[in-house]
A protein has these predicted regions:
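Surface-exposed loop/turn elements that mediate protein-protein interactions on large endomembrane-trafficking
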Residues: 35-64, 95-136, 167-274, 281-318
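N-terminal Sec-pathway targeting helices
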Residues: 1-14, 24
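Sec-dependent signal peptide cleavage junction
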Residues: 20-37
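Residue position within the beta-strands of beta-propeller blades
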Residues: 81-83, 157
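Acidic/hydrophobic-patterned starts of short beta strands in beta-sheet-rich repeat architectures
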Residues: 152-156
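Short, solvent-exposed, Trp/other aromatic-anchored flexible loops in extracytoplasmic proteins
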Residues: 136-149
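Blade-terminus and WD-like Trp-Asp/Gly-His loop motifs, strongest in beta-propeller folds
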Residues: 72-75, 146-151
C-alpha cells in the first residue's frame, strides 16, 4: 500500500513539474511577444527602377513598372521614386496623442531617387531629404507626386514632426537638390493639363475618348497622359495588339500590361498634338484615327471628330 502511494505521489510531482515548466514557457513567450509589440515598427518603401522609353523626338515617355502600381512621379526631366527606411508614423490623432513619435534613429533615411530622362541609360541620382532638412526633426510621408514649373521638376513632400507629429509641407527641387519655399508655389497640385481637359470637353469629346479607351483597351485616357485602370482584372485584359501603336512601337507594346504611364512631357505638351497622336496610336492597325464623336447638346446629333482642328471647327459652329 505504501509502495502504491509513493508511486501516486511520484506521478503527481512529475505532472506538477511538467505543468510548471509549460507555464513558465508560456510566460516567457508572452513576455517576448509583448516586447515585440512595443518595439517601433519600421517602414521600408522602395520602388525599383522602372522600364523607361523616351521616343518620338523625345516628346513622349513610356514607363512600365513590373509587379506593382504606383510609387512613381513623372516629370519633364526626371522619373522619381522613393527609397525610405524609417520608423512608422502615427498619423491618426489618437495615436499621436497617446504615443507621439520617437526620435529619428541613425539608420533611418528618406531619399528620392531620380532617373535622368535626358541622359543615355537614364542614370539615377539620390536626393537625401533628411540631409537637406539639416536637423532630424521630421519624417516624410510615403506618397510621391511630381510638379513642373520654371523648367524644373519638383517633388512635394509632407512631413510629420518628431514628438507630436504636427505636419508641414515642403517642395524639393530635384534638378538642384534643394528645398524651396512652398509659398512660392501657390498653384502646387493643379494639373498641368487641366485647361486641356476643358478644351477637349466640348461636345462631350473628352468623355467619349475616355470611354472608347476604357472599353476597347482597358486604359485610362486623360489630357496629357494614359495609364491603366487600378484593378488587376482590368490590367490582365489590356490588349493593344491590333493598334497602330503596337505596330509602330512593338517593344513598348509588349510591356503594356505593366504600364505605369504613357505621357507627353510638360514642356513639349500641346493639346493639339496629344489629341491627334492618341487618335492615331489607338486606331485599329492600318486606320487613321480612333472613332470618337462630338454630340450636339441640343439635338443629340453625333459628328465624328478626326482631329483637334475638326473639334475646333465643330465647337465654333455649336456655341451656346
Amino acid at each position: 500500500m505504501k509502495r502504491v502511494n509513493k508511486k501516486i505521489i511520484g506521478v503527481l510531482v512529475l505532472l506538477v513539474s511538467i505543468g510548471s515548466f509549460y507555464l513558465l514557457k508560456q510566460v516567457q513567450k508572452h513576455g517576448k511577444t509583448s516586447q515585440q509589440e512595443t518595439k517601433q515598427k519600421y517602414i521600408d518603401a522602395k520602388t525599383e527602377k522602372p522600364t523607361i522609353h523616351v521616343f518620338d523626338d523625345n516628346k513622349f515617355v513610356f514607363v512600365a513598372q513590373k509587379d506593382g502600381i504606383g510609387g512613381i512621379a513623372f516629370g519633364q526631366d526626371y522619373i522619381s521614386v522613393l527609397d525610405v527606411h524609417q520608423k512608422e508614423i502615427n498619423q491618426s490623432m489618437i495615436d499621436r496623442e497617446k504615443n507621439g513619435s520617437p526620435k529619428i534613429a541613425k539608420d533611418e533615411y528618406f531619399n528620392i531617387i531620380s532617373y535622368d530622362l535626358n541622359a543615355s541609360g537614364f542614370p539615377s541620382k539620390k536626393t537625401e531629404v533628411y540631409q537637406l532638412l539639416g536637423k532630424k526633426e521630421y519624417r516624410g510621408a510615403y506618397d510621391i507626386s511630381q510638379y513642373y514649373a520654371d523648367n524644373k521638376d519638383y517633388i512635394p513632400v509632407t512631413l510629420y514632426k518628431v514628438g507630436n507629429n504636427d505636419s508641414r509641407k515642403i517642395i524639393v527641387d530635384i534638378t538642384n537638390q534643394k528645398i524651396e519655399n512652398l509659398e512660392n508655389f501657390e498653384d502646387n497640385g493643379k494639373s498641368t493639363f487641366s485647361a486641356a481637359e476643358q478644351e477637349l470637353s466640348k461636345g462631350n469629346v473628352y468623355n467619349n475618348i475616355r470611354q472608347a479607351m476604357k472599353e476597347k483597351y482597358h486604359l485610362k485616357f486623360t489630357a496629357g497622359y494614359i495609364d491603366t485602370l487600378l484593378s488587376k482584372e482590368d490590367r490582365e485584359k489590356i490588349d493593344i495588339s491590333n493598334t497602330n501603336f503596337a505596330q509602330d512601337y512593338p517593344e513598348m507594346a509588349k510591356d503594356i500590361k505593366d504600364l505605369a504611364r504613357l505621357y507627353m512631357r510638360p514642356k513639349q505638351y500641346s493639346t493639339k498634338e496629344w489629341f491627334d497622336t492618341v487618335l492615331h496610336w489607338f486606331a485599329p492597325k492600318g486606320q487613321d484615327v480612333l472613332e470618337v464623336y462630338a454630340t450636339d447638346p441640343k439635338t443629340g446629333e453625333k459628328t465624328q471628330i478626326k482631329s483637334y482642328d475638326e473639334l475646333q471647327v465643330w465647337s465654333a459652329n455649336h456655341t451656346d
